[in-house]
Amino acid sequence: MAKLGTMPPQHAAKPVDEHAARLIPEDSVPIQTQKPFTTLSAIGIGYGVTNTAVGIPLILSTAMPMGGSPQVFWGFLAMAAVGLATATTLAELVSAMPHPGGQYIWVNALAPKRYRRGLSYTTAMISWVAAVATGSSGNLSVPLNAFSIVTLLQPDFVYRRWMGFAAFQAINVVTCFGACFEHALPKLSKAFLLFNVVSVGVIIVALFAMADARTSAKDFFTTVNTSGWPDGVAFIIGLNGANWCFSCLDVATHLAEEIPSPGTNIPKALLWTIFIASTSGLLVVLAVLVNLGPVDVSDYSGIGIFYRITGSKAAAIGLWIPVLILVLASVWSIQTWQSRLAWTISRESGFPLHRHFSKIFPAPFYTPIWSLVGSAVGTALFGCLYLASELAFNSLIATGILLQYISYSIPTVLVLWQGRRNFRHGQFWYPRLGLVANFIMLAWTVVAFVFYCFPANAQVRPSQMNYVSGVLVVIATFIAALWILYARKNYRVMEI
């Protein structure tokens, strides 16, 4: 039976019984004393969310109409560079200040005293909403891509929104339960990492082995833009898909209390995640584009492309099922991500019901169960929006990646504002390369913030409109209202 106890904030860094999970009352910091993660399992859960190689077939339907093969190839390389810059930026910050709160803790440490609480809370809520929006996207992606198998076998099948909604909510419940057991998380993350690598290898070999023809050099490098936007604008808008393949990089930073030596192990996990993502993702990009043949805009769904290349429905389905399993696994990883954010924010009294959300449950869980449930409820509510309006739901989940970049940018700007030379850095620190990485990430944040608010087609109909900018205003209003009505009086960062 695990021991229960308290730990005052000023003593939170002292060695503790590694087998004890502590439930902490008011005026103390609830800490996670279980440290089952290693660098490898942190890579597994981080890459499990990023899911780069598996994500390539999923984003082709949105990327190919914006520029064809060059859009996918050069766009992937561009986003790999942005991903490396983002991972480097986060690695420097977590090396200096390892903490499961991540971005909002860094902001609290770096911001001027006058603005510290407000900026820290804003960053915290942006991070959490980004995680819930991303999880909602994954919850819907699984059933939509599962029903694509039905469509391949039965072309007259008519998808109904309630089908996706029911599957969305079922997946939300199952993955929430699967994230409840602390000591199972690293084992599952390593297992899924291995399954991911093997599946990607099988997909690459199968596409090359079963393709009847190869794409000509002319087709490979010919831009095919059917969006109505100028080629340059279409290219940037089309980067959204590849950008998702290098998103959610802060996941590993929120494991700081669940891994030994987080100041060194988490930066390693971040950079290894980018290396694995870039290598495996590029191989899948080449496997698809080299074997796709002449550009045909009729069907760029992932399973449709697998069928087109292999010429076999059975082979296409056989390759598609591992993709679905890995997308489902990414939703499980996201449940861990968003719950850890809710838990740490609750430790600072950032949520109503924070006394419940901040608790670490004893054996056999050792996890913040109420934070898991609360975050899953938030995801479920987002799913209800899908049932009401698919357009509103799509605009909401599209904000996920922008909110991530905003949460990364706030502490980065504060580091630059006070001067990198004055920053008390950790072991992972590159004075010049780190500065370049900071500017690349910030520059891309600005570009993405502008162009990701554009609709995919220049000749847009109301049913295709992009309401991301409006959703961002709603989210900002929600955070401001929560601050004024609750957090201004209750929120306090106790760790720093």
UniProtKB/Swiss-Prot annotation:
Annotated GO MF terms: transmembrane transporter activity
Taxonomic superkingdom: Eukaryota
Membrane topology annotation: Multi-pass membrane protein
Subcellular location: Membrane
Any GO CC annotation of this UniProt entry: membrane
Record-linked Pfam families: AA_permease_2
Residues bearing glycans: 225
Transmembrane segments: 40-60, 72-92, 124-144, 162-182, 191-211, 270-290, 314-334, 368-388, 396-416, 434-454, 467-487
Signal sequence region: none
Chief localization: membrane
Keywords: Glycoprotein, Membrane, Transmembrane, Transmembrane helix, Transport
Knockout or disruption consequences: Leads to lower intracellular accumulation of SW and higher extracellular yield of SW.
InterPro entries, A to Z: AA/rel_permease1
Coiled-coil ranges from the UniProt annotation: none
Family: Belongs to the amino acid-polyamine-organocation (APC) superfamily. Amino acid/choline transporter (ACT) (TC 2.A.3.4) family.
Purpose: Transmembrane transporter; part of the gene cluster that mediates the biosynthesis of swainsonine, a cytotoxic fungal alkaloid and a potential cancer therapy drug. Does not mediate the secretion of SW and the exact role of swnT in SW biosynthesis remains to be determined.
Name this protein carries in UniProt: Transmembrane transporter swnT
